[in-house]
Structure formats: C-alpha cells, structure tokens
C-alpha cells in the first residue's frame, strides 16, 4: 500500500513518519510517499493533505496540476485525511477565505480559518475520539475551527470537551489538530484502515 502525503508545503515529513509507523503497527506492507505530481496519483491507495498554509497549498495544488485529479479521486471514494490546513482544503465552506482561494469542497462542513488566532495561541489538549476510549493529545496550531456540520453524512470523530474538532464523512477525515505531531499513531491507523 502507498499513501501519498501531498508534499508541496507544510508538515509533510511528520505525516510520512507517522504513516509509516502506523502501517508497521497494523502489520501492513507499504509506505508513505511525498506526493508532488499528478502522475504519482495512480500509485496511491490513500491521500493525506497536511497542515501548513491553506492559501499556499491551494495555489501549489493548482500550479502542479494536482487539484482537479485529487478532487475527482476523493469524489470517487479514495480515502483522504486533512489536518489543519488540510481540513480547510477539504471543506465545503470556508469563513475568512479570500475570493481567489479555491478549495476541494468535498467535506460537508463550514470552517473558520485561523480561528484560534496567532502562532502564540497554539496549544495541546486531550481530545476524545469516537473509536477509542483513551484520550488523544491534540496539537492545535493556528487551527481552523469546525463551526457547522452541513449534512447528516458528516459524523463527529473527535471532541475537545464538548466541541467537535474532527469529523468523518464516508472516505474523508478532517481534523482541526495535528495527529502527526505526537508519538500516538491511533488516528493514522484508523485512517489507514479505510484503505485496506
């Protein structure tokens, strides 16, 4: 199995390391790769859109020709996980977006960009997961905020206290936080099971 981490900007290497460790823990043969060109898409069983800066990721996905084929693959059922800026890229509606920004618009949520403020307002906190009783340490860095679920297809996947901070819709996972910045691979393992 190959998992493509869109490697244009953001915390790509951390996702590659977390994915490779999760594959090993699941006993699955495979690897995570830096996904930079459309021709690599035929190799992958799943895609991760990392954190970073959503405007830059959007622009580079369009410039490299990844934008439209990635959107089509997701719409056709390819598993995808977006974290932080990746969540913004997946979202149907984005508050605070500039008119020239394009998003994949495949996940039925409304998000607010940079809802947690500046870099100095970043924090870590225990997050409750729908698929495991043990808390997960969520790392929130200038994170977007899920402000509304726009359809019944979207299911909460993670909560910070009583607020939804992660969602799942069929083959799509969107997270406000960065699961790749911890040593805990449970979120990556859960995601990879979608591609098995």
From Swiss-Prot:
Catalytic residues of the enzyme: 84, 178, 180
Gene Ontology BP term (one): glutamine catabolic process
Swiss-Prot/TrEMBL keywords: Glutamine amidotransferase, Hydrolase, Lyase, Pyridoxal phosphate
Gene3D superfamilies cross-referenced by the UniProt entry: 3.40.50.880
InterPro entries attached to this UniProt entry: Class_I_gatase-like, PdxT/SNO, PdxT/SNO_CS
EC numbers for this chain: 4.3.3.6, 3.5.1.2
GO molecular function: glutaminase activity; pyridoxal 5'-phosphate synthase (glutamine hydrolysing) activity
Keyword Repeat part of the UniProt annotation: no
Protein task: Catalyzes the hydrolysis of glutamine to glutamate and ammonia as part of the biosynthesis of pyridoxal 5'-phosphate. The resulting ammonia molecule is channeled to the active site of PdxS.
HAMAP family registered for this protein in UniProt: PdxT (MF_01615)
Name of the protein in its database record: Pyridoxal 5'-phosphate synthase subunit PdxT
């Amino acid at each position: 199995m190959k998992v493509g981490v869109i490697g244009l900007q953001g915390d790509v290497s951390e996702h590659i390391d977390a994915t490779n460790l999760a594959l090993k823990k699941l006993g699955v043969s495979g690897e995570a790769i830096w996904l930079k060109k459309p021709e690599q898409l035929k190799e992958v069983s799943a895609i991760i859109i990392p954190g970073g800066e959503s405007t830059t990721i959007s622009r580079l996905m369009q410039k490299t020709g990844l934008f439209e084929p990635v959107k089509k693959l997701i719409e056709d059922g390819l598993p995808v996980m977006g974290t932080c800026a990746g969540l913004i890229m997946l979202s149907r509606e984005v508050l605070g977006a500039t008119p020239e920004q394009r998003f994949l618009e495949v996940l039925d949520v409304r998000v607010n960009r940079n809802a947690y403020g500046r870099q100095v307002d970043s924090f870590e906190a225990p997050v409750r997961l729908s698929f495991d009783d043990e808390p997960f340490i969520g790392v929130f860095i200038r994170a977007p905020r899920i402000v509304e679920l726009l359809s019944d297809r979207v299911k909460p996947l993670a909560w910070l206290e009583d607020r939804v901070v992660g969602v799942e819709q069929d083959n799509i996972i969107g997270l406000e936080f960065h699961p790749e910045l911890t040593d805990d691979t449970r979120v990556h393992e859960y995601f990879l099971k979608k591609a098995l």
